[in-house]
Swiss-Prot record:
Pathway, per record: Carbohydrate degradation; glycolysis; pyruvate from D-glyceraldehyde 3-phosphate: step 2/5
Key word Transferase present: yes
Disulphide connectivity of cysteines: none
Source organism phylogeny: Bacteria, Bacillati, Bacillota, Bacilli, Bacillales
Gene behind this protein: pgk
Enzyme class name: transferase
Major site of localization recorded for this protein: cytoplasm
GO BP terms: gluconeogenesis; glycolytic process
Annotated protein name in UniProt: Phosphoglycerate kinase
GO molecular function: ADP binding; ATP binding; phosphoglycerate kinase activity
Length: 394
């Protein structure tokens, strides 16, 4: 990683504005998964131990640029206080006189949390005035919100232009090291598994990965567009007619580059979306015209598991089927299990794949689970991440 991190600077006595990703799922005001809070702890502890005055900033949900108690960071602050074993204060404002006063009272090793940065319309517009308002609170800017690093917002990118020292936190440092090595100097054989519902969302990723991988595995809703491109009938399965030509181009590119391109050989079908009309598995050339597929079948799981077993590095992004419904979860579970059982270094690209690994109790068997869905996707497309680009070079 060619960007400075908190390991490269002295933070003692400094006001450190740290952008974290505390955008956690809530139900009735209670946190249902605190993974993102825990992921920020190493950076927070490093700063506290180094004698910094720590100012944490994050977004939560999409409050559309206005204050909404439903999206307050209060539940996060309560959980963070428990995890750190110290009383942490929530500041009602994220910038301006109230925030400035709270910061002025900080002692070395203290931690405060500013209220949701998306309560201000300038945040998502990367408004320079708001960015300057954040910068007024800080001597140092630390970005540790990998989940928001692909967005050029006031608290992720804008602020970096108004402070002298802007560095990465430990989480972003690790993400960039792991993903960066996979894309620039991968252990081989290198296999990528791409699932999810739409080809449109994964065009950049598939295109970029075909330049690097030895094997590309396709699953999930987007596989039916590829199967259709090969001449199979896919019934009422998810299909992007306008992406069939693109799918053909990808298969041609794989052939030209000598990349093994694996697609489903069987699938799990149903008459209608849901578990009531579940039929079971069928070979890929036997999908009835009035049925749809919602998962890969057992033969495909076996085929994919063999490819995973033969790999030294596997990147997985996107589920193999509608894993939220048990009858269509076996494909995703099978792939997750194969990864858990293999000796390969496994990188799970955030979002649904991470949720699936969690659901099947296999998360701790994966080598690296990325904390950024969109960010890891854009990084795998070879795109620069604004929240990283703005940091100081080494």
């Amino acid at each position: 990683m060619n960007k400075k991190s908190i390991r490269d600077i002295d933070v003692k006595g400094k006001r450190v504005f740290t952008r974290v990703d505390f955008n956690v799922p809530l139900e009735d005001g209670k946190i249902t998964d605190d993974t993102r809070i825990r992921a920020a702890l190493p950076t927070i502890k490093h700063l506290v131990d180094g004698g910094a005055k720590v100012i944490l900033a994050s977004h939560m949900g999409r409050p559309k640029g206005e204050k909404n108690p439903e999206f307050s960071l209060a539940p996060v602050v309560a959980r963070l206080s428990e995890l750190l074993g110290k009383d942490i204060k929530l500041v009602e404002e994220a910038y301006g006189p109230v925030a400035e006063e709270a910061v002025s009272k900080l002692e070395e090793g203290d931690v405060i949390v500013l209220e949701n940065v998306r309560f201000y319309p300038g945040e998502t517009k990367n408004d320079p005035e708001l960015a300057e308002g954040f910068a007024k609170l800080a001597d140092v800017f630390v970005n540790d919100a990998f989940g928001a690093a692909h967005r050029a917002h006031a608290s992720t990118e804008g602020i970096a232009h108004h402070v002298e020292t802007a560095v990465a936190g430990l989480l972003i440092e690790k993400e960039l090291q792991v993903l960066g090595k996979a894309l620039s100097n991968p252990d081989r054989p290198f296999t990528a598994i791409i699932g999810g519902s739409k080809v449109a969302d994964k065009i950049g990723v598939i295109d970029h990965l075909l330049d690097i991988v030895d094997t590309l595995i396709i699953g999930g809703g987007l596989s039916y567009t590829f199967l259709k491109a090969q001449g199979y009938e896919v019934g009422t399965s998810l299909l992007e007619v306008d992406k069939i030509e693109q799918a053909k181009e990808f298969m041609k590119k794989a052939e030209d580059k000598g990349v093994k391109f694996l697609m489903p050989v069987d699938c799990v079908i149903t008459k209608e979306f849901g578990e009531e009309t579940y039929v079971g598995s069928r070979d890929i050339d036997s999908i009835p015209a009035d049925h749809m597929s919602l998962d890969i079948g057992p033969k495909t799981v076996e085929l994919y598991a063999e490819a995973i077993k033969a790999s030294k590095l596997v990147v997985w992004n996107g589920p193999m089927g509608v894993f939220e419904l048990d009858k269509y979860a076996n494909g995703t579970k099978g792939v997750a299990q194969a990864l858990a059982d293999s000796d390969a270094y496994s990188i799970i690209g955030g979002g649904d794949s991470a949720a699936a690994a969690e659901k099947f109790g296999l998360a701790d068997k994966m080598s690296h689970i990325s904390t950024g869905g969109g960010a890891s996707l854009e990084f795998m497309e070879g795109k620069a991440l604004p929240g990283v680009e703005a940091l100081n070079d080494k």
